[in-house]
From Swiss-Prot:
Tissue localization of expression: Expressed in root caps and lateral root emerging sites, in trichomes, in epidermis in stems, sepals and anther filaments, and in pollen grains and torpedo stage seeds.
Compartments, record wording: Cytoplasm, Cytosol
Role played: Required for incorporation of 9(10),16-dihydroxy-hexadecanoic acid into cutin.
GO CC aspect terms: cytoplasm; cytosol
EC class name: transferase
Gly residues composition bias: residue spans: 467-484
Knockout or disruption consequences: Smaller rosettes, collapsed or tangled trichomes, postgenital fusions between the rosette leaves and flower buds, fusions between sepals, altered cuticle permeability, loss of cuticular folding in petals, abnormal flower and silique development, altered seeds surface, defective mucilage extrusion and semisterility. Increased susceptibility to salinity, osmotic and water deprivation stresses.
PANTHER family (UniProt xref): BAHD ACYLTRANSFERASE DCR, FAMILY REGULATORY PROTEIN, PUTATIVE (AFU_ORTHOLOGUE AFUA_3G14730)-RELATED
Species for this entry: Arabidopsis thaliana
Keyword annotations of the record: Acyltransferase, Cytoplasm, Transferase
Full protein name: BAHD acyltransferase DCR
Pfam families per record: Transferase
One GO BP annotation of this record: cutin biosynthetic process
Length: 484
């Protein structure tokens, strides 16, 4: 792919925000200093190709995006700021219109004249559009000297690619898509945004955590599984793929999970619990684990309504926490999707305000920043959410053709869920796995819900009668010491 960067500028709030604004990063924010910038990729196909001709593209399309960005930053001014820390190592995000070192949002314009929208939508992995998304391999900690948001708008042969990199120490997915929808709203002609962000982080957790920022020798090192403690082992080749579960497929999976009435009178399984159980089970089968091997499921859960007192949906920042659970691989394989869904449901239900506070208290006593190594042995970890209305982000030239995550923050077993382009309750699943495991997964008719499903897939991990040596109920509860 031939890409030419045409310009790189910075965008600040159109009307300067008066005074120096400072917000201490909370215990919900700080662990993400060790992660990489959170990348998003949106692809738009233009109906009127004349909008791609110069000077129209620069003078109208690009300038409208930049003008809208400047206006929306008046409300989301933290994104135009920078990370800072005091002498004790307490981190904050700050914005000061008078500070010459605060440049605002980085905004680049690029051209890829020979690339079409279809060229990019047909690609499974992120390699094809990696150059279209800024800040590959950049740690959030670098927000001390870099902008907290970088945008790259690339003109294609028949459309526009928008790559974004958000500093994950400053905001989570809910805040990201609140910002994106607000920016798009302004670009479509609104005089003001419909929903204001709630900016006071201290209402969620009012603590001053002092951090010892000793960077790891290799911040890019990631591992997952038996070889995590053996640095001499060559890391496996990882591949990425999108699985698109149609409205019908999601309904089918949910119906199957709920076809068995739980003996403990638990609630019906949600779409999320049913689908992620389906994926967890089939990834475990494809990995060919031993029946007694433990497999961990991790979900980054929104805690806005879980904390006490609850925070508004518009809370700007990170208000997520990892929930860990797990079971023996054989137990997961020997049962239908209701088993994994029950394990997931119980873990999520148990993660109430008291558990959240206890996790935060524990972390504050002994904070560890650089933990981007392992989400748990043989894990499947879930980020993003299909409830984010990503296909409604319309800047005035139509809804996106596709929405993806970038190449950052991927490891063996990591998956991102997005609202399906097909509508309804369809869900697109991006997942990263070892190449050999992915090959088995794409051949599984049962996983893909093909007309002819594979039979007795679960026998691969059982001892013949559907049982394994478990600990009674097969659950492994997370202790909060893993991936966050």
């Amino acid at each position: 792919m031939k890409i030419k960067i045409m310009s790189k500028t910075h965008v600040k709030p159109t009307k300067p925000v008066l005074g120096k604004k400072q917000f201490h990063l909370t215990t919900f924010d700080l662990p993400y200093l060790a992660f990489y910038y959170n990348q998003k990729f949106l692809l738009y196909k233009f109906q009127n190709l004349l909008d791609l001709e110069e000077p129209t593209f620069q003078n109208e399309v690009v300038e409208n995006l930049k003008d809208g960005l400047g206006l929306v930053l008046e409300d989301f001014y933290q994104l135009a700021g920078k990370l800072a820390k005091d002498d004790e190592g307490v981190f904050r995000v700050e914005y000061d219109a008078e500070d010459s070192e605060i440049n605002g949002v980085e905004f680049s314009v690029a051209h890829a004249a020979d690339v079409t929208v279809d060229d990019l939508t047909a690609e499974d992995g992120t390699a094809k559009f990696k150059e279209l998304v800024p800040y590959n391999g950049i740690l959030n900690l670098e927000g001390l000297s870099r902008p907290l948001l970088a945008v790259q708008v690339t003109k294609l042969k028949d459309g526009l690619a928008m790559g974004l990199a958000f500093n994950h120490a400053v905001l989570d997915g809910t805040s990201t898509w609140h910002f994106m929808s607000s920016w798009a709203e302004i670009c479509r002609g609104a005089q003001s945004i419909s929903t204001q962000p709630f900016l006071d982080r201290s209402k969620a957790r009012d603590t001053r955590v002092k951090l010892d920022l000793t960077a790891p020798k290799d911040p890019n090192e990631t591992s997952n599984g038996e070889d995590a403690a053996n640095p001499t082992v060559e890391p496996p080749q990882l591949v990425e793929k999108i699985f698109r579960f149609s409205d019908f497929a999601v309904h089918t999976i949910k119906s199957r999970a709920n076809s068995v009435i739980p003996s403990d009178s638990s609630k019906p399984f949600s779409t999320f619990q049913s689908l992620t159980s389906h994926i967890w089970r089939h990834v475990t089968l494809a990995r060919g684990l031993k029946p007694e091997d433990i497999t961990i499921f991790t979900v980054f859960a929104d805690c806005r309504r879980r904390v006490d007192p609850p925070m508004p949906e518009e809370y700007f920042g990170n208000l997520i926490q990892a929930i860990f659970t797990g079971t023996a691989a054989g137990l997961l394989a020997a049962h239908g999707p209701e088993f994994g869904a029950s394990v997931i449901q119980k873990a999520i239900a148990a993660h109430d305000a008291s558990v959240i506070d206890a996790r935060n208290d524990e972390w504050e006593k002994s904070p560890k920043i650089f933990q981007f190594k392992d989400a748990g042995v043989n894990c499947v970890a879930v980020g993003s959410s299909p409830r984010f209305r990503v296909y409604e982000v319309d800047f005035g030239f139509g809804k996106p053709e596709t929405v993806r995550s970038g190449s950052n923050n991927r490891f063996n077993g990591m998956m991102y869920l997005y609202q399906g382009k097909a509508g309804g309750i369809s869900i697109d699943v991006e997942i990263t796995l070892e190449a050999s495991v992915m090959e088995k997964l794409v051949k599984s008719k049962e996983f893909l819900l093909s007309e002819e499903e594979e039979e007795d897939d679960g026998k691969k991990l059982t001892n013949g009668n559907g049982h394994v040596n478990g600990n009674g109920n097969g659950y492994v509860n997370g202790n909060g010491n893993g991936f966050v």
